[in-house]
Amino acid sequence: MNPRRKSRLSVVLFIFLGISVASALVLYALRQNIDLFYTPTEVVNGKNNESHTKPSIGQRIRIGGMVVEGTVERDPKSLKVRFDLNDIGPSVTVIYEGILPDLFREGQGIVAQGVLIEPTVLNATEVLAKHDENYVPPELEAQMQKIHKPMGISDLKNESDRDRQEKQFKEGNQ
């Protein structure tokens, strides 16, 4: 091989090596910021019911579902809240310490981001309340109501029974 080809080959190899190292460092840095989205059923059973796709304990994930009515437990001495999330299958318990969004209530859809500390317990660092701003076709809404009513989840557009009871109690005391 002549010297000119050797120098070209070494330059190409050096560039390839540099790009490989840079890519590896970027992927390593992003690894801690990538949060995979799961539903409660996928956390318990794995995606597509494959157990090897379950998130591992200690993994950062985002989980979205409906807050199960009657499961919200607030610590009176701190901002710690514990509640269950589910979709159409098993529930996952979420533990969160902080101020919850104004739209958070039982029967409401939320997304929680945090670390899985047990197979069905998420220690959340952030809780986002989902709200309905889009049109839902009547047939889809009817189908959702069929699924959510048997699970004890209230009407998605109206206030929950607990909210109504609290409102009646406040009105009765005035």
UniProtKB/Swiss-Prot annotation:
Residues 30-174 are periplasmic. Residues 156-174 have a biased composition (Basic and acidic residues). It is found in: Cell inner membrane. It comes from the Bacteria. Residues 149-174 are annotated as: Disordered. One of its GO terms (biological process) is cytochrome complex assembly. InterPro entries: CcmE, CcmE-like_sf, NA-bd_OB-fold. Keywords: Cell inner membrane, Cell membrane, Cytochrome c-type biogenesis, Heme, Iron, Membrane, Metal-binding, Signal-anchor, Transmembrane, Transmembrane helix. One of its GO terms (molecular function) is heme binding. SUPFAM superfamilies: Heme chaperone CcmE (SSF82093). Pfam families: CcmE. The chain crosses the membrane at residues 9-29. Coiled coil: none annotated. The keyword Metal-binding applies. Its main location: membrane. GO terms for cellular component: plasma membrane. Residues 1-8 are cytoplasmic. Belongs to the CcmE/CycJ family. NCBIfam families: PRK13165.1 (NF009638), PRK13254.1-1 (NF009727), PRK13254.1-3 (NF009729). HAMAP family: CcmE. Heme chaperone required for the biogenesis of c-type cytochromes. Transiently binds heme delivered by CcmC and transfers the heme to apo-cytochromes in a process facilitated by CcmF and CcmH. This is Cytochrome c-type biogenesis protein CcmE.
